[in-house]
């Protein structure tokens, strides 16, 4: 059994009470902001803008006032699986150093083309109980610079924040949870990988071919348009409907290592679905010889 560092950083009582005691999740009115909105709020005292990606890229130019974050800074060290959430105490310290407080309005933007690194940070903050305070900049840095908005290479001094996380128990799931819900009505297992990995035509290095039995394929890349912005809500909703996901259903998503799937997690939350991330994803499921796999496009939407 794989032990999740994030979940083992708490006592049992905290894990059972966290979701009800604090936190909660954002919604379509708070999870996404435009370049216009960010431009008009850049000088807000409680705003924390985080550029997600390599620090070398951040140093070449970023949104004024932004701070830099790489995914390696919010990934567990010394564990068998890649990109697992670390204990919440470590996450709290990382975001405190970035100036985050419990009353901060946090805006994340991607420094590069794809949004999956940014949605991974969103999920992390959501798991810490800060989801209601956090939004993605639609289109990321490319949208900002494409509109000729100001950028800087200045690395500002950051005043540490005062943040206390309250871990949410309704976000991260493990293989046991997925296995026990494979045929449960109203629970949809969603494979966020590209179709060739889902079908088994392409095999990840050292892993088994195929997908979790009964999973549907909603590739993470299908959620965004050619400019890297999320597609229209009506189009996103239509894709979820075509995959057999109904209003009131729960979405449990996975990918290779728990990064691409956060795009589906984010989109599902945006559309109002209850969502979970199987953090171990295919790297975990595939390594478990006691768990079944399915090959082919049997459940293709």
Language-model-detected regions and their locations in the chain:
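Thiolate-centered catalytic microenvironments shared by cysteine-dependent enzyme domains
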Residues: 86-177, 181, 201-202, 260-276, ...
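C-terminal soluble interaction/assembly domains
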Residues: 236-238, 243, 248-298
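Solvent-exposed loop/turn segments at secondary-structure junctions
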Residues: 54-57, 72-76, 112-116, 141-143, ...
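Mature N-terminal segment immediately following signal peptide/propeptide cleavage
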Residues: 28-56, 65-71, 93
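Helix-loop module immediately N-terminal to the HCX5R catalytic loop
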Residues: 76-104, 220-251
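Active-site neighborhoods of enzymes that stabilize oxyanions during catalysis
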Residues: 28, 32-33, 40, 75-77, ...
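Bacterial N-terminal signal peptides
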Residues: 5-19
């Amino acid at each position: 059994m794989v032990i999740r560092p994030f979940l083992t950083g708490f006592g049992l009582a905290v894990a059972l009470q966290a979701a009800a005691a604090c936190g909660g999740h954002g919604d379509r009115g708070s999870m996404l902001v435009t370049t216009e909105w960010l431009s008009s709020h850049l000088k807000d005292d409680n705003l924390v803008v985080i550029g997600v990606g390599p620090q070398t890229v951040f140093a070449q130019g970023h949104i004024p006032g932004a701070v830099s974050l790489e995914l390696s800074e919010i990934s567990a060290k010394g564990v068998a699986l890649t990109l697992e959430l670390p204990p919440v105490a470590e996450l709290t310290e990382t975001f405190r150093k970035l100036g985050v407080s419990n009353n901060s309005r946090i805006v994340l933007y991607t420094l590069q083309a794809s949004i999956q690194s940014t949605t991974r940070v969103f999920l992390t903050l959501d798991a810490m109980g800060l989801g209601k305070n956090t939004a993605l900049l639609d289109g990321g840095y490319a949208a900002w610079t494409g509109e000729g908005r100001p950028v800087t290479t200045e690395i500002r001094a950051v005043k540490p924040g005062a943040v206390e996380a309250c871990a949410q128990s309704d976000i991260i799931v493990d293989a046991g949870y997925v296995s026990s819900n494979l045929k449960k009505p109203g629970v949809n297992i969603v494979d966020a990988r590209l179709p060739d990995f889902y079908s088994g035509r392409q095999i990840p290095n050292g892993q088994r071919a195929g997908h979790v039995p009964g999973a549907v394929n909603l590739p993470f890349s299908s959620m965004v348009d050619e400019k890297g912005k999320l597609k229209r809500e009506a189009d996103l909703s239509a894709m979820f409907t075509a995959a057999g996901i109904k209003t009131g259903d729960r979405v449990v998503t996975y990918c290779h290592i728990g990064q691409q799937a956060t795009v589906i997690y984010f989109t599902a939350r945006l559309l109002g679905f209850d969502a979970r991330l199987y953090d171990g994803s295919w790297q975990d499921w595939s390594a478990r010889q006691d768990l079944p796999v399915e090959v082919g496009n049997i459940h293709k939407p």
